[in-house]
Regions:
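Short acidic/glycine-rich loops and adjacent helix/strand connectors
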Residues: 1-319
Length: 319
């Protein structure tokens, strides 16, 4: 059987192809010219993959047994009010039999190159499908989730914190990573950290409010001069809050995976790893791994043997 998995929208576009024997991976930004459009390349429309697979693998859509996509309809001004689905739905916008896979489910499934046994998955990013900011998935079932409108998202709040810190970037996609680096120059305000500990992941929006720090310091001007300490403290709080959040669902000896854009944070990963020794975080934990998750969905659907992992993670095709 031949499968195609795709993530095309917004950034980190990638396509994975299983030819019945071997797996092939393509991340589009590797073949773009320099600058921000190359670095964060995404396809401008959701038909571009048809040209790409012809160019790369000499494939036509009808050559494939299964096609799957992780898709952000709001980029194309399409309706997304019914996007609270799990695990899949039919993709109706092209005249092919295409399966749309839940964004967070694809993240969870993409752990397969590093583990054959993990069944418990945490996903945190800026946005999943529609309004979903985090998910806990166990045994291929959605156990719990958070909503952006209610709680915000950890990825979005890191971006907002970078704006508060007046970090200058060419692309907002870089801002959370730069905030992660900059916060290391501050000091933890232990008294403020203790105040933040009343918040959990369901109240993350409140925890990140700089006005709380101004009230804590007692003077807005002085608080602005201590912004590095604020940054270090809320970043530390988030690491603790993630550990506490995981404890609601899993035991310390469980094998768990952590994915989504937030899993690129090495400080938070260290917090989690110190408590959960069987933590799995993979190099493609961000959106560049979504197409691999789609392929895993099809492998499981058709009860096929595990894909070969030879030469992982060096799977990018050469052309």
């Amino acid at each position: 059987m031949k499968f195609l998995g795709m993530r095309l929208c917004e950034h980190d576009s990638n396509i994975s192809y299983f030819d019945g024997e071997n797996l092939h991976y393509f991340k589009s930004e590797r073949y773009q010219k320099g600058g921000e459009m190359g670095k964060h390349h995404a396809y401008a429309n959701f038909e571009s993959w048809i040209t790409e697979i012809k160019k790369i693998w000499n494939l036509e859509p009808n050559d494939l047994d299964e096609i799957g996509i992780v898709f952000d309809p709001w980029h194309y001004r399409l309706n997304y009010e019914d996007d609270n689905f799990f695990p899949t739905k039919k993709f109706d916008y092209l005249p092919y039999n295409i399966t749309r896979v839940d964004h967070h489910y694809a993240h969870a499934l993409s752990s397969w190159p590093l583990t054959e046994t993990c069944k418990k998955h945490f996903v945190f990013d800026a946005y999943g499908d529609y309004d979903i900011s985090w998910s806990y998935i166990e045994d291929d079932k959605l156990v719990d989730l958070g909503y952006f409108k209610m709680n915000d998202s950890l990825g979005n709040l890191m971006n907002g914190a970078s704006i508060e810190m007046e970090i200058v970037v060419q692309s907002r996609l870089d801002s959370s990573g730069k905030f992660m680096g900059l916060q290391a120059y501050g000091n933890i305000d232990e008294e403020y950290l203790n105040k933040l500990r009343v918040f959990d992941m369901t109240m993350m929006r409140a925890a990140f409010q700089f006005t709380l720090y101004e009230q804590h310091v007692g003077d807005p001007l002085l608080a602005r001069h201590k912004k590095l300490d604020w940054a270090r403290t809320i970043h530390y709080w988030a690491g603790e809050a993630l550990v506490n959040h995981f404890a609601k669902y899993v035991n310390k000896d469980d094998e768990i995976s952590f994915s989504g854009g937030c899993a690129q944070n090495v400080v938070w990963n260290t917090f989690i790893k110190n408590e959960y020794k069987n933590l799995v975080v993979f190099p493609h934990c961000n959106d560049e791994g979504l197409s691999l998750g789609v392929l895993e969905f099809f492998r499981k659907k058709h009860n096929l043997p595990r894909y070969k992992t030879n030469n992982f993670p060096y799977w990018q095709i050469q052309r």
